[in-house]
Amino acid sequence: MSVAPQVVTLDTPDSIATYGQRDEQFLLAEITVAEDLAPADLTLTAGGEEYEPREWIGEGLSLYPYGNLYFATEGETGWVAFELPKPLGSSSATLAWPGGSDDLAGAVVEALNREPTSFDVTVDAPEQVPADSPATLSVSVANTGDAAGTFVGALNRTGPSVAYTPETAVELTVEPGATDTWEYSYTPDPEDAGAAFTFMFVWRDGDERREIGILEPEESDGESGSDSS
C-alpha cells in the first residue's frame, strides 16, 4: 500500500496532471482477486467513517507511476484509490471486502495522519542540447512546512515529433526543512536537429515550461569536419 497526497493520471487523451486538494489524500492498494469483485465491494473504515474507492479519476485508466486501475474482472490485478481527508484523524484503519478484512499497518496509518505541508519548487533545464545527447530536467523541491510530506508532479512533453505526450510522474518524500532533487532526461534523435521541444512540469500549486532547442549532433572522437593533408 502507498499513501499519496495527489495521484497522477490523464487529464486529456495525451497529457497527465495531478489530482487532489491540500485537505485530501489517497490510499493506494494493489489487489489481485480470484473471482469477480466490484471496486465498490471494497471499503476502508477509519474514525467511524466508511470510504469506497474512486472508480474514475481524471480521464485515465492508469495511475502514474503505479499501473492500471482495478476493474471487476476475475483474476485481474490492479490498483484501487481511496480518497480520504488529510489528515485522516484516526489511530487505525481497516480495509474490508466480502469474506475478509485487513488492518492497515502502523506506518501506513501514521502517514495518513500527517498534516499537510508546503513546497518551494525550482525547475531547471538547458536552453539547447545536441541531437543524440540527453537533455535533463532538474526539479528541486524544498519542504517549507513543519511536517514531512510527499511532493507529487507530472511531466509532459511537446515536440520535436509529437504534439503532446505524457512522460512520467514523480513522488518525493521530503522531511521538513529539507530539499530533494529529481531529474529526468530525454534524448532527441539526430534527425530532430534544428527543431525544439518543451518539458511541461505540473504540480498541485503550479507549473513550469522549459523549451529546449536541438543542435546538430556532436562529432564523435576521431571524426573531422574537413580533410587535411
Regions found by a protein language model. Give the residues of each.
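Conserved functional micro-motifs across diverse proteins
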Residues: 1-152, 161-181, 185-229
